[in-house]
Design a protein with these regions (language model features):
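Short N-terminal targeting/anchoring amphipathic segment
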Residues: 2-6, 66-88, 102-106
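A short, active-site helix/loop in glycosyltransferases that binds the activated sugar's phosphate group
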Residues: 114-115, 141-142, 147-190, 235
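Conserved donor-binding/catalytic core segment of Leloir-type glycosyltransferases
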Residues: 189-228, 234
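Acidic donor-binding loop of glycosyltransferase active sites
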Residues: 266-279, 292
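Short hydrophobic beta-strand element within catalytic cores of glycosyltransferases
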Residues: 293-300
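A charged, aromatic-enriched C-terminal amphipathic alpha-helix characteristic of glycosyltransferases
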Residues: 336-368
Length: 377
């Protein structure tokens, strides 16, 4: 098939494209390189600063449109898949629908439906916005209020979301929680794909013996700490290391270049990732592919959803239980003899559920099913 990815996030589409090319498909990625990550793309669409940057970006989009025709599958990164206002994005969406056989959506980040479900606090038991009926620290911030008012929950975004969801041929969710929200909106044209990890390029550094000290690792994204719950993970790790200084240590890095980040991560035993996720995300999965043990989201309903009953190596932490992070980190220190087994199981888990070839095949099967129903019935 001839496949076009429009937009990227955390190298998701580029990794998926690499796997699909290996299967034999012709794949093009057009994106801004996930902004600061500067990921690989075939066609660059990056928006510069100021009015001149905006004008140039619109011109680049218009100039690129003829190259975005004639594909069997167009896969969008988000309902807002370009750095444009919804009205202009809608025009490009209509163009893509008219000049290609199908248009799909990656459910892999915030959009109107997901943020609405989080903010209402009824569908999901917790999120970055709510802990049951209680607003999170981020939810109470000025940033979140501005986001709800002028961004994801605006009337303009609601209308745009409805238009896109009605117009796409299907959507593929990368996380359990995105699937859980979207199956109530588009149940008949939704699939689960997972996050693709290029395990072939990641050399495992297994924990072969019980370490004298457990080396915890946490990466801080400036400006995203409260949103991801990294602030709470960091505080708990510091308390545990202070309590067990002879048996544990903590390395904290902030805004490192990606390659240096991976290098420092590989020298650790346990990575602390996200607090408000039901599903291990890209950072945790890459660490697990290296043989690290991840402290992250991995709720029982996620494991049940993917049909995994035996290999459950992720240390799940709950934001709903007071002291849960401290307790789980203390458990790791007190049971560090289990780290070699968890290390091997972590890599095994990623190979089984998130290897980029596995995720690519899930996408391929779903696309073919939808195309067959659309054109052969």
């Amino acid at each position: 098939m001839k496949i076009l990815f429009v937009g990227d996030a955390s190298n998701f589409h580029n990794t998926l494209a690499t796997a699909l090319r290996r299967i034999g498909h012709e794949v093009t990625v057009v994106s801004d390189g996930s902004r600061w990550m500067d990921t690989v793309r075939d066609i660059n669409l990056s928006r510069g600063a100021g009015l001149s940057g905006a004008v140039r970006y619109v011109w680049d989009v218009v100039k690129t449109l003829p190259r975005l025709r004639g594909y069997d599958v167009v896969h969008l990164v988000n309902p807002i898949f370009l750095s444009l206002r919804p009205g202009k994005v809608r025009l490009v969406f209509d163009y893509l629908r008219k000049h290609n056989r199908s248009v799909f959506l990656s459910a892999l980040g915030s959009d109107y439906d997901y943020v609405k479900a989080c903010v209402e606090g009824k569908l999901l038991k917790y999120s970055e916005y709510m802990l049951g009926d209680t607003p999170t620290e981020y939810m109470q911030s000025a940033e979140a209020a501005e986001e709800r008012r002028n961004s994801w929950l605006s009337e303009t975004l609601r209308k745009h979301q409805r238009y896109v969801m009605q117009g796409i041929d299907g959507a593929v969710a990368c996380l359990y929680e995105y699937y859980y929200v979207d199956e109530r909106i588009i149940p008949n044209k939704l699939a689960y794909g997972g996050i693709p990890i290029d395990t072939e390029s990641i050399k495992p550094h297994y924990i072969e013996d019980e370490p004298e000290k457990v080396n915890f690792f946490i990466g801080i994204q400036r400006g995203r700490s409260i949103y991801k719950g990294t602030d709470k993970l960091l505080a708990a790790a510091r308390r545990v290391v202070a309590k067990y200084p002879e048996r544990s240590a903590l390395r904290v890095v902030e805004n490192l270049p990606y390659e240096e980040y991976l290098k420092q991560m590989s020298e650790s035993h346990v990575i602390l990732d996200q607090l408000y996720s039901y599903t291990p995300a890209t950072n945790a999965l890459i660490a697990m592919a290296q043989g690290l043990v991840a402290v992250s989201g991995a709720e029982p309903e996620y494991y049940d959803f993917i049909g995994e009953n035996k290999c459950r190596p992720i240390i799940n932490v709950s934001p709903l239980v007071d002291g849960d992070i401290d307790a789980k980190l203390e458990w790791i220190v007190q049971n560090k003899h289990l780290l070699p087994r968890l290390s091997h199981e972590s890599r095994e888990f990623v190979m089984r559920h998130n290897d980029y070839m596995v995720v690519a095949q899930r996408h391929e099967e779903f696309w073919k099913k939808i195309l067959k129903a659309k054109y052969e019935t």
